[in-house]
């Protein structure tokens, strides 16, 4: 498993505003979209392309286009939905699937309650959107779900991660082609399974339920 922590002052600035408990939901949503676009730029460095002939106003030349089959973007519901627009604005030709997962707040174990994905992901590059990599359970289960449908490589984009979640995810994805792109790696998890210092519950803050 490869881990890349994006190092950019704009990412750090936007993340600082997201962490602020006084940031209202509309601002939180807008900044999340902007931040994800920056992370997506890093995450798509290895996206597959193929050569194409194009005509400029001056002459013929060769360029590239994103290869078929199209990459698949998979937000983990519900908080991952807040990251979707930032991703597809950068890669609008990508296909979008959905995976609904929830964390049991007592056991911290993930459960799948919904999915809308192609049955066969052979030769597909998949990009999973999950803002908070806390225990690693939900993201690990989502990645396993994709590989069971024959995905060839998976990149997860997370705004924040805890070391415990990364360690659990590395164990769960051993031997698989997985890359994790992070906005920041935080200190630890608290006794409730939340990232510290973190930014709270991303889903609640995105949708104004706190």
From Swiss-Prot:
<comment type="similarity">
    <text>Belongs to the UPRTase family.</text>
</comment>
<protein>
    <recommendedName>
        <fullName>Uracil phosphoribosyltransferase</fullName>
        <ecNumber>2.4.2.9</ecNumber>
    </recommendedName>
</protein>
<feature type="binding site">
    <location>
        <begin position="130"/>
        <end position="138"/>
    </location>
    <ligand>
        <name>5-phospho-alpha-D-ribose 1-diphosphate</name>
    </ligand>
</feature>
<dbReference type="GO" id="GO:0044206">
    <property type="term" value="P:UMP salvage"/>
</dbReference>
<dbReference type="InterPro" id="IPR000836">
    <property type="entry name" value="PRibTrfase_dom"/>
</dbReference>
<keyword id="KW-0328">Glycosyltransferase</keyword>
<dbReference type="GO" id="GO:0005525">
    <property type="term" value="F:GTP binding"/>
</dbReference>
<feature type="binding site">
    <location>
        <begin position="200"/>
        <end position="202"/>
    </location>
    <ligand>
        <name>uracil</name>
    </ligand>
</feature>
<comment type="pathway">
    <text>Pyrimidine metabolism; UMP biosynthesis via salvage pathway; UMP from uracil: step 1/1.</text>
</comment>
<dbReference type="InterPro" id="IPR034332">
    <property type="entry name" value="Upp_B"/>
</dbReference>
<dbReference type="InterPro" id="IPR029057">
    <property type="entry name" value="PRTase-like"/>
</dbReference>
<dbReference type="Pfam" id="PF14681">
    <property type="entry name" value="UPRTase"/>
</dbReference>
<keyword id="KW-0021">Allosteric enzyme</keyword>
<comment type="function">
    <text>Catalyzes the conversion of uracil and 5-phospho-alpha-D-ribose 1-diphosphate (PRPP) to UMP and diphosphate.</text>
</comment>
<keyword id="KW-0460">Magnesium</keyword>
<feature type="binding site">
    <location>
        <position position="78"/>
    </location>
    <ligand>
        <name>5-phospho-alpha-D-ribose 1-diphosphate</name>
    </ligand>
</feature>
<dbReference type="InterPro" id="IPR005765">
    <property type="entry name" value="Ura_phspho_trans"/>
</dbReference>
<dbReference type="GO" id="GO:0006223">
    <property type="term" value="P:uracil salvage"/>
</dbReference>
<keyword id="KW-0342">GTP-binding</keyword>
<feature type="binding site">
    <location>
        <position position="103"/>
    </location>
    <ligand>
        <name>5-phospho-alpha-D-ribose 1-diphosphate</name>
    </ligand>
</feature>
<feature type="binding site">
    <location>
        <position position="201"/>
    </location>
    <ligand>
        <name>5-phospho-alpha-D-ribose 1-diphosphate</name>
    </ligand>
</feature>
<dbReference type="GO" id="GO:0000287">
    <property type="term" value="F:magnesium ion binding"/>
</dbReference>
<feature type="binding site">
    <location>
        <position position="195"/>
    </location>
    <ligand>
        <name>uracil</name>
    </ligand>
</feature>
<dbReference type="GO" id="GO:0004845">
    <property type="term" value="F:uracil phosphoribosyltransferase activity"/>
</dbReference>
<keyword id="KW-0547">Nucleotide-binding</keyword>
<keyword id="KW-0808">Transferase</keyword>
<dbReference type="InterPro" id="IPR050054">
    <property type="entry name" value="UPRTase/APRTase"/>
</dbReference>
